[in-house]
């Protein structure tokens, strides 16, 4: 999955960017606890393990 596809998936689920540090977005949800750090490398692929971890943390 590409980085921009993962960000779109998170935003569709209700996650929004609270800040960005370099090429990483820190996202938060209105009702879910915690924050997610998501790489913002455009059309570059995100590793399968990292993709799985981010989805698990997001509850997707």
Description of each model-found segment:
Residues 1-19, 24-26, 31-60:
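Basic nucleic-acid-binding interfaces
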